[in-house]
Swiss-Prot record:
Protein name per UniProt: ASTRA-associated protein 1
Gene: ASA1
Gene3D superfamilies: YVTN repeat-like/Quinoprotein amine dehydrogenase
Physiological role: Component of the ASTRA complex involved in chromatin remodeling.
Domain of life where this protein originates: Eukaryota
Keyword Repeat: yes
PANTHER family, sorted: GUANINE NUCLEOTIDE-BINDING PROTEIN SUBUNIT BETA-LIKE PROTEIN 1, TRANSDUCIN BETA-LIKE 3
Cell location: Nucleus
Record's subunit section: Component of the ASTRA chromatin-remodeling machinery complex composed of at least ASA1, RVB1, RVB2, TRA1, TEL2, TT1 and TTI2.
Region (Disordered): 372-391
Main localization category: nucleus
Organism of origin: Saccharomyces cerevisiae (strain ATCC 204508 / S288c) (Baker's yeast)
Compositionally biased region (Low complexity): 378-391
InterPro entries linked: WD40/YVTN_repeat-like_dom_sf, WD40_repeat_dom_sf
Length: 443
């Protein structure tokens, strides 16, 4: 699929959206589908925009459940919901990570569908801000929250992996202890993987070369992945080092297939990691669930980093697409890869058949009258190329997917069950646009 044929394929597979969610007045910047049993017995959608509005949506009624307005109306970059404690982490462009707790005394019944009349009210759930801390957000990177391996019975403990406060090429790892006082520790400060790789002469990387800022984080099992501005992807896990008698970062993955282009997004599915950039392909890495135990390591105790002496650059498989400048990716079931480009196009790609099955766009419909004697209406561009579509398609600010799921019918009336099954039986692609709308599309 190359050249003009790409345009024919994309136009032929254009698909209308099934639903539109309207509440945001500014561009959507973050989307995530989560399970929140304390709020709903079906998945809910989280959305954020560039004016500091966070919204939790009921996907059955297509209405907001609750919202938060970030002080200063700061651009929301990413969020993370911790289901076990009803705590929400929101990272904003003002370089602050704010942590909110959902007041348990005002939560909805777990059987939300019996209270559909409440679904259009956004003030019946109360959020309490319990902490805030500075994080470097120069790069618009997201962050990772993971449960500690050994929580205690008296409190819950989590790791926060994020950009270092000052150096956007390095990371910090915090330990968050959620008890009556909410404690915060920083066992890892300024972990510098680029410096380590250059010291070890990995790939013959010049000591003067720059990895650039960290663009994205992803997590697969116990491995955290960092995508850099220069196209490198680094994966590590936290392991206990007998010699130092403390935890250190162990490198288990290095790849550079997008070099020198920046990593724009990453996602995981099963034991696979997917990454994208300004190229016209997606890379797919198969990550072993149980990594082999090693006996020989390269290490720098000052940096608190080690890697197996056998570590080599990972060889991926590539999925070539009729789009480039791919800003968002997600995986649905086993076969479908969903990608959004800077042009405003989102495609559903069947990896088994190597075909584009659906294309979603939201057009600005800027119609102009041609001076030609033939007299036609156009969208203001005489070109059918992907690059020209940037001017007449709304940009995609965020994209995520929801896979079909099973429904527990206990206690549901027939009408309620029908509405939930209509959502549950399908796979969905949810796209947030720069005009503040969120489109729901059946896959």
């Amino acid at each position: 699929m190359r050249g003009f044929s790409n345009e024919i394929i994309l136009k032929r597979t254009l698909t209308l959206s099934d639903f539109t969610l309207r509440y945001h007045k500014r561009g959507i910047t973050a989307l995530q589908v989560i399970k929140a049993p304390s709020v709903s017995n079906v998945p809910v959608l989280l959305s954020g925009d560039n004016y500091g509005y966070f919204v939790m949506w009921d996907l059955v009624t297509k209405r907001p459940i609750t919202h938060i307005e970030i002080e200063g109306n700061s651009h929301i970059i990413a969020f993370w919901w911790v289901e076990t404690t009803n705590v929400l982490y929101i990272l904003s462009k003002d370089s602050m990570l704010r942590i909110f707790e959902l007041d348990s005394s005002t939560q909805l019944s777990i059987d939300l569908v019996r209270k559909l009349s409440q679904a259009n009210k956004t003030d019946h759930l109360q959020w309490t801000k319990i902490y805030e801390m500075p994080i470097n957000t120069l790069n618009f990177a997201n962050f990772i929250i993971e449960a500690e391996v050994k929580p205690t019975k008296d409190n819950k403990s989590y790791r926060l992996v994020c950009c270092h406060t000052d150096d956007s090429e390095t990371i910090d790892i915090y330990q968050i202890i959620e008890d009556s006082t909410f404690k915060l520790k920083r066992p890892f400060n300024n972990i510098n993987f680029p410096r380590f790789l250059k010291q070890q002469n990995f790939l013959g990387i010049s000591k003067d070369s720059k990895f650039g800022i960290i663009m994205r984080f992803a997590k697969l099992n116990d491995v955290i992945f960092l995508g850099y501005e220069n196209g490198f992807v680094v994966g590590f896990k936290i392991t206990f080092d007998e010699g130092l008698q403390r935890d250190i970062a162990e490198l288990v993955h290095v790849s550079n297939d997008h070099y020198p282009n920046p990593i724009l997004d990453m996602c995981v599915s099963g034991d696979e990691l997917y990454s994208c950039s300004t190229d016209d392909f997606i890379t797919k890495y198969k990550i072993p669930v149980n990594l082999q135990l090693e006996t020989k390591y390269l290490r720098d105790d000052a940096l608190l980093i080690k890697c197996p002496s056998s570590l080599r650059v990972s060889e991926p498989s590539k999925v070539h697409l009729p789009l480039k400048n791919i800003g968002h990716i997600d995986k649905v079931k086993d076969d479908y890869l969903v990608v959004s480009s800077w042009s405003g196009m989102t495609i559903v790609y069947n990896m088994r058949t190597s075909e584009v099955e659906q294309t979603f766009v939201k057009s600005k419909n800027n119609l102009v009258v041609s001076d030609s004697s033939m007299g036609d209406l156009t969208n203001g561009s005489g070109s059918n190329t992907e690059s020209s579509s940037k001017s007449h398609n709304y940009k995609v600010g965020a994209m995520t997917c929801l896979e079909s799921f099973d429904v527990q019918s206990d206690g549901l009336r027939l009408g309620q069950l029908r509405r939930i099954k209509a959502l549950a039986k399908c796979n969905w692609c949810l796209i947030g646009y720069e005009d503040g709308t969120i489109k729901l599309n059946k896959i």
